[in-house]
Every structure is written in C-alpha cells, then in structure tokens.
Amino acid sequence: MPTALPAWQSLTQHAESIRATHMRDWFAAPDAEERVRAFTLEAAGLTVDYSKNRITPDTLSQLLQLAEEAGVLTLRDAMLRGERINNTEHRAVLHVALRGRAEHDYRADGEPVMPEVLRVRAQMRDFANRVHSGAWTGHSGRRITDVVNIGIGGSDLGPRMVCRALDHLAVPQVRVHFVSNVDGTDLAETLDHLNPDTTLAIVCSKTFTTLETMANAHSMRRWFVDHGVAESQLKHHFVAVSTNREAVVQFGIDPDNMFTFWDWVGGRFSLWSAVGLSIVLAIGPQQFEAMLDGARAMDRHFATAAPRENLPLILGMLSVWYRGFFDAASACTVPYCAPLELLTDFMQQLEMESNGKSVQRNGAAIDTDTGPIVWGTAGTNGQHAYFQLIHQGSQIVPVDFITTLEPVRNLPGHHAKLLANCFAQGEALLLGRTAEEVRAGGVTDEALVPHMVFEGNRPSTTILMERLDAASLGALIACAEHRTFVQGAVWNINSFDQWGVELGKKLAKPIQAELEGAPASVAHDASTVALIRRAKAAL
C-alpha cells in the first residue's frame, strides 16, 4: 500500500507545511533564478521547466525518496529485462524494444526479440517503398493515392496523432486517412472522397475480432466490390496488422500482406510497431526511423539518468504529488502547437487506460486516488474555452504547456504571438492578480474587484522543443509513456492491462442481438430495457 510507506507519510506532513505558501513568494526571493535552473531539465531534445510547481528542493527530495521506497526504478529495470510485469495477463512489457537496434539485447521470457522486431520493421519499410514508388498498385494497375487505416483505440489514436503532428513532413505520393468509429458516418464520409481503384485499406486489429474495426473493414470490403473490384482482386487493396493469421486469411487478405506484432506490446504503446504502418506510409521510412531515434534517446535517458536528472521520473512524481496530496482530480495538457492538437486524445488513453485502476497489483483495494482525468485542447483555443476554470475555479488543475521554439509554418508575426500567449498563461497561473493590483489597474468599482482577482499559485510545467520534427515527437511520446509508468509504479497498480474496457463490450453483444430482432437472452435493468424498446421502434 503506497500510503503506508514512510515517504508518503512524510510527504503528507510536508504538503501541509507548504500548502499556504504562495509560489510568488518563492519567485520574489533572491534565489529565484537558481530555482529555475534547479528545476529545469534537458533530455533527448526536450527542455522542461517545472519551476512553476508547488514544490521546494525538499519536496523533490521527498518525492524521489517515495519513488525509491515504492520500487519505481526496480520495476523499471524489471520491465527492461523483459520480466512479466503485466502480472494480470502474465506478459512482458517491451514497447521499448520496438525502438531498439540490432545491438540491443531485449528479451521476453529469455528469448531475444530484436530479430523479429527488425524483420517487421524492414517489412514495413519495404512495403512503404513499394507503395510510394508505384510498384504496389490497385487492381486496375493504378498506383495507390490514398490509405485508410481502420482501427480503434491504440490502433488509431497514436498513429492518427503522429500523422497529424508530422503532416508537414508527409510524402507527396499518398494521403492517409483514419476510420475508427462504428458509426457508419465515419467510414462513409471518408470514402465519399476516395477512388476505390487507388485506395488501400490497413485493417489494424491485434485479434482481428475488434467489433468496430471489423464492422468497418467488412463495410469497406463491400465498398470495393460494389465499385467493381473483383473478390479475387481485393488482395491489391487490403493489408492487415494483426496477430491472428487465421482470421486475416479468412477475411481474404494474403498472409504475405500481414504485419504482425506481439503480446508484449500493449495497444496504447504500439505506434512504434506494425501498428504504425500508416505512419510509415504517411511520412516515409526515414522519418519513422528518426521518430524511433528520438524515442530511443528518451529510453536511454530514463534507464540511465540519476533520479534528480531523470525527466520522466520527476514528471511522473509531480503527477503523484498533485493527485495524492493536493486532491487534483484532473490534469490539463495544452500544446501551443496546432499540429499537436490530437496529443491530448492520445494522452487520455495512455494515462487513463493505464492508471484508471482502483486495485493494486495484488488485487487489494488501493486507499488513495489514482489516475487523474486528462483533458485539454490546443492553445490558444483553450484560452477561450476552459481557461477560466483553471485560473479562477475552485480546484487545482496542473497544466502542461507544450510548444516549439521554431514554427512549423512560418507566417510573419504568428509564432511570437503564440509563444507570448503560452508563456503568459504560465505566468498568470503562477502570480495571479491581487485586489491591490486590480485597483492599481484602474478599477474603481469595489463590487467588481473580487471578480477580477486571480488567486494564482496554480501549478504548470512548460515543455519546449526546438522544432516539431520526428525525433522530438518520438522523445515527447516516450517521455509520456515513461511518466505514466512511474505513476502506476508508485500506486502499485498494473498500468498495462485494461479490464475496464471489457465489460461494456461484453454487454453490447446481447443488446445488439435484441436490436436486430432476437429475443432477449439476458436480463437488463429497467432503464436499458426502455432504451432498447425505443431504439427497436426506430430501427
């Protein structure tokens, strides 16, 4: 139980001792510049300023002591050795191997994994080169111009986010689209703009049984046939990313066009694997390799850096600090970089599916709050939507600001405005505005003064990249993966299963049968019965 650890008890007292301290006092002190230097880290091309957090040097020491007592780095080392740290599914957790090179000796159950990782990576590279060169064609002999990735969850969110983020690096030969929702509108609106003769589908499902993915795959299959593609020619328009060879063949996809991955790859950690085939097609093998390089640099940092210099460790411990000692129920991610607009969607799955747990690894209930709700949008949009709550709401919401020093697209004057707003929001959250400052600003209506006061003392962290390139994005994502791991390790939960996803899927099957006319096979609550009855009348 993490709350029983001596360091947790000490941090509980420490949090009370500094709770009333305003961060503006720390920044008004003569050693403010030293504080910034001490609480700024650089790793794998990222610069992170975490000085605007409600911590002192003693706080950091105690948080790192908690990490030690919780065995965070011991569990990290076990993960890197390929031990089965996913204890509920009896699996290793080796997404770091997906970034590895031939000289790395990653193993699962004692067996080297790099030969297979490199084989699939080469298969992805060769396939992308064939598509880009026009060597791979559709049934009519025309080159492929559009690729549709059909997947959901980890088979969609990561690749979709990366392709959006690196769109400025996209190859000119193909356009990549994503379909995930079982709502037919998602697929139909995508296909409305495509030519079946020049379209390729990637069916991305580990089991090749995922309801949403297979419904969309079968509908896209019908679309091809309805537009004149013979059944025997569908092999020119479908490839699969899966571990289920039998189901892939049964669907009609040539097994030579199947890209595999392994049970030690969790869905939300899988964009580096064959699940990232859409990424390779979108930006090309060279940029994909650069993304792996950036992630590998962060992996090396996480594995070797001393605790006080270990970026993912410290960021993870800050999350534990606010969730466990300041009752922060949510955390906000705000990328001041429009191409990163889908990063928060990715982070939601990464953190909430990993750490949205209420039992420990041994099955016992945990007696502290775990995974915060992750939310946010791209800045500056968020300033005109929800920043009111972050600045003047009744609860603390730690914010991560993420931006680039160089613009992705350089329109005169735009980037300075973007950076100014990013930095100003962090400063405003830090300092706030007192009643005296409001009055000094010319407000004479005393009834208005309380409404214009900002408490400040709201924590934020700023993550800077020199530019948004494949390597820096790889490092950013790997850092997020590792900080998520750190949180789960402290809470003593298994961050690598997702049993909470299963129950709803199981209950949907008999309801679907009833909606399609079958008699009820299971009992439902009265509300669900009424909803089914109403839906059946409309279908």
Swiss-Prot record:
GO BP term, example: gluconeogenesis
Record keywords, A-Z: Cytoplasm, Gluconeogenesis, Glycolysis, Isomerase
Catalytic site positions: 353 (proton donor), 384, 505
Enzyme category, top tier: isomerase
Catalysed reactions, semicolon-separated: alpha-D-glucose 6-phosphate = beta-D-fructose 6-phosphate
EC number from the UniProt entry: 5.3.1.9
Highest taxon above the source species: Bacteria
Signal peptide (from-to): none
GO cellular component labels: cytosol
Localization terms from the record: Cytoplasm
Bilayer-spanning residue ranges: none
Pathway(s) of this molecule: Carbohydrate biosynthesis; gluconeogenesis; Carbohydrate degradation; glycolysis; D-glyceraldehyde 3-phosphate and glycerone phosphate from D-glucose: step 2/4
Repressor as UniProt keyword: no
GO MF terms held by the record: carbohydrate derivative binding; glucose-6-phosphate isomerase activity; monosaccharide binding
Entries under PANTHER family matching the protein: GLUCOSE-6-PHOSPHATE ISOMERASE
Primary role: Catalyzes the reversible isomerization of glucose-6-phosphate to fructose-6-phosphate.
Record NCBIfam families: PRK00179.1
HAMAP family with a match to the protein in the record: G6P_isomerase
Protein family according to the UniProt entry: Belongs to the GPI family.
Name by which UniProt lists this protein: Glucose-6-phosphate isomerase
Organism: Ralstonia pickettii (strain 12J)
